[in-house]
């Protein structure tokens, strides 16, 4: 029974977080979401812990975690933004590889889970598809790259561009159903894609990529890549989370990802964390 109660509280709290960020433009005097934290804490069985917050072209963006107030269990972690971001498709920013925002997660998330910070890249013109794609223009649609990194931003700045041949990722470290990653992109790393995406003739809608360090030693980001059209459709959806057999360290790792909409806000939610060794 507790599982279902927590699930209901989690869903309600996510909606509450969404409502806050969707209203932030009119409530810039409350950037930390104290009202929402109190609402979730006192009335709905979950506690909201806020990470960092910024404003990009009028769109408020915040990171957060939802935890069980009784035992501190991390129920979900994510980022929420108002949909002005998708409507405007900002030009590249001054973050790594042109990121328009780079926000750390709360300490409790950084200390215990795979997630350390998020970087958001806006691609109004799209970009090339991975080598071997049957549709080389698949990713040449307006979209966002949401990089959920397991390492600090200062280490992302140090990642070099490197062309193949590069070391293969060991089988136990490569998620099942994913391709070997390609070249290393400067200030980002190497991208591995679901094998099905290379044979998909249709334009990009949404896909979950896995990122690897240049030497292929370990996975260091999860990347939901989502088109502008999908975001503006305001329809909730889920993506499978890549699950390697080995990670190289012990931590909590998310097994579920969903995108949830509420009014003029969108939330990218990782949940159902499991302990990996």
At which residue positions do the language-model features occur?
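Bacterial Sec-dependent N-terminal signal peptides
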Residues: 3, 7-33
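Metal-centered catalytic cores of metalloenzymes
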Residues: 26-277
């Amino acid at each position: 029974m507790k599982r279902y109660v927590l699930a209901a509280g989690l869903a309600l709290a996510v909606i509450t977080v969404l409502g806050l960020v969707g209203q932030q433009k009119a409530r810039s005097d409350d950037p930390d979401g104290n009202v929402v934290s109190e609402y979730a804490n006192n009335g709905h069985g979950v506690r909201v812990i806020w990470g960092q917050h910024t404003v990009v072209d009028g769109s408020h963006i915040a990171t957060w975690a939802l935890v069980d107030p009784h035992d501190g269990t991390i129920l979900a972690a994510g980022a929420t933004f108002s949909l002005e971001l998708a409507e405007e498709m900002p030009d590249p920013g001054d973050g790594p590889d042109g990121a328009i925002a780079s926000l750390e997660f709360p300490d409790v998330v950084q200390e215990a889970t795979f997630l350390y910070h998020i970087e958001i890249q806006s691609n109004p013109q799209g970009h090339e598809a991975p080598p071997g794609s049957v549709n080389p223009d698949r990713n040449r649609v307006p979209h966002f790259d949401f990089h959920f990194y397991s390492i600090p931003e200062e280490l992302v700045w140090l990642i070099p561009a490197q062309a193949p041949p590069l070391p293969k990722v060991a089988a136990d470290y490569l998620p099942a159903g994913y391709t070997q990653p390609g070249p290393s992109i400067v200030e980002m790393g190497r991208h591995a894609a679901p094998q099905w995406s290379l044979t998909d003739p249709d334009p990009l809608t949404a896909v979950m990529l896995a990122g690897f360090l240049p030497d292929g030693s370990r996975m260091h980001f999860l990347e939901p890549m989502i088109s502008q059209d999908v975001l503006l459709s305001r329809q909730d959806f889920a993506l499978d989370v890549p699950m390697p057999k080995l990670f190289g360290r012990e931590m909590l790792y998310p097994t579920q990802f969903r995108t949830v909409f509420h009014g003029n806000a969108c939330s990218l939610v990782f949940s159902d964390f499991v302990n990996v060794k």
